[in-house]
A protein has these predicted regions:
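Adenylate-forming
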Residues: 45, 68-72, 88-115
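Gly-rich Lys/Arg/Thr-decorated short loops/hinges at beta-loop-alpha junctions or inter-strand turns
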Residues: 7-8, 64, 115
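Conserved AMP-binding/adenylation subdomain of ANL enzymes
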Residues: 21-39, 49-89, 104-105
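Conserved S/T- and glycine-rich ATP-binding loop of Class I adenylate-forming
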Residues: 3-6, 40, 91
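Active-site segment of SDR-like NAD(P)-dependent oxidoreductases
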Residues: 4-7, 46-47, 71
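Generic hydrophobic alpha-helical scaffold/packing signal
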Residues: 1-4, 29, 44, 80, ...
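Beta-strand segments within the central parallel beta-sheet cores of soluble alpha/beta enzyme folds
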Residues: 15, 40-41, 112-115
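Conserved AMP-binding A3 loop
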Residues: 1-22
């Protein structure tokens, strides 16, 4: 796993396999209330640590929804339509994407989604 590289070059994060997975499962199960039957979608690339965090959701018995492409293509509503169509219960994305949606007046109804 590597750091994001936000403030410089990405750096390798040294860890042991079991401890990281156990902690991520704890975060998802206890802090996010993710469990069997839930569907998690966090728009991320596999190079960002959120991919590892999302993949750890499989340890809770939940399902993952992934997107191969841009969240704003063909329009900013595409990500929200995907979440609704796939029955996503837990959704995550970047603040920049949320700001872009706000700036363009995109206001999806997400009654059944935990952000």
């Amino acid at each position: 796993m590597f750091s994001s590289g936000t403030t410089g070059m990405p750096k390798c994060i040294v860890h042991r396999a079991g401890g990281v997975l156990l902690n991520q499962k704890k975060e998802l199960a206890l802090h996010c209330d993710l469990a069997a039957g839930d569907r998690m979608f966090f728009f991320t690339t596999c190079g960002w640590m959120m991919w590892n965090w999302m993949a750890a959701g499989l340890g809770t018995g939940s399902s993952l929804v992934t997107l191969d492409g841009a969240p704003g293509h063909p329009d900013l509503g595409a990500l929200w339509r995907l979440a609704g169509r796939e029955g996503v219960t837990h959704l995550g994305t970047s603040p920049k994407f949320l700001q872009a949606c706000m700036n363009r007046g995109v206001a999806p109804r997400l009654d059944d989604v935990e952000l």
